[in-house]
Design a protein with these regions (language model features):
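Active-/binding-site microenvironments in catalytic and ligand-binding cores
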Residues: 7-275
Length: 275
């Protein structure tokens, strides 16, 4: 599948050539937001000591802060911060599972601003916490809304963000320590790479792989294809299925396997009706 994703496709604009264009478009979109022609939706959870974390990566909460300066002593307030790269709403860079992949600081700016869609599987996930998105889910979405734009970020809404910020409910570990939350099937991920060539995949759970996945098959398939992931995304229920754009801005950490990110959706405002 990775070869297909890296191969030519005349329907797709080369993403890496879009950096300057993306910056120009961002300026234009800023004007539209100020003029009320577009609205912004924040897709980012607040990152603090209450944020859920991967239990196997730390014996306790890995988010730590300490006071560096104070108003009383220094005339200003700053903190020192220690946390894993994959904390809160964050981006997984391709190098996370591909030794030859891009680190988070090397992802082209043009890939951070993209068209986006939301595929809603929340009904299925509500009845099955281990639900994995299927090819059928994607095909049904395409049948209803049309083709997924090439070079898009494809979000999957499972409804899991309703459990944030409870560590117990969000990570949902059983008595054996196995996590239980929805994700993608490897077949669905392969379908996306072959048919849509997305720049990114986003989800409102802790991982694009389901919680009980033992081999991270979706990561291992998509990251060699250059696809980044946005995980722990918020507010997907506030987005339309299609017709909007996303801006994903991770910390530019040198060599980073990922980084916390501010993720925002830009949605065209509904036109006013004049009588």
């Amino acid at each position: 599948m990775a070869d297909v994703a890296k191969g030519g496709n005349r329907r797709c604009v080369t993403v890496t050539k879009g950096c300057d264009l993306a910056l120009n478009v961002a300026d234009q979109l800023g004007d539209k937001v100020r003029e009320g022609k577009m609205r912004l939706v924040d897709l980012t959870h607040t990152l603090d000591h209450n944020s859920p974390y991967w239990p196997e990566e730390a014996s306790g909460n890995p988010f730590h802060t300490s006071i560096a300066t104070t108003y009383q002593k220094d005339g200003n307030f700053t903190r020192n911060l220690s946390l894993p790269e994959h904390s809160g709403t964050h981006m997984d860079a391709p190098v996370h599972f591909d030794p030859k992949g891009e680190s988070v600081d090397r992802i082209a700016v043009g890939k951070l601003f993209a068209p986006a869609v939301v595929i809603d599987v929340s009904s299925a996930a509500k009845s099955n916490v281990d639900y994995r998105v299927t090819v059928k889910d994607i095909e049904e979405w395409v049948g209803r809304y049309g083709e997924i734009p090439c070079g898009a970020v494809v979000f999957f809404r499972t409804g899991w963000d309703e459990r944030w910020p409870s560590q117990e409910k969000y990570m949902n570990a059983d008595t054996d320590g196995v996590l239980h939350f929805p994700g993608l099937s490897v077949e669905a991920a392969g379908y996306l790479i072959e048919h849509a060539r997305p720049v990114g995949i986003g989800i409102d759970t802790a991982s694009v792989d389901s919680g009980r996945s033992a081999d991270c098959a979706v990561h291992n398939l998509t990251m060699p294809a250059g696809v980044y992931h946005l995980e722990n995304v918020a507010n997907l229920d506030r987005l339309p299925a299609t017709g909007f754009s996303v801006i994903a801005l991770p910390l530019k950490l040198g060599g980073g396997s990922g980084a916390p990110a501010r993720v925002m959706a830009l949605i065209p405002a509904e036109p006013e009706i004049h009588h």
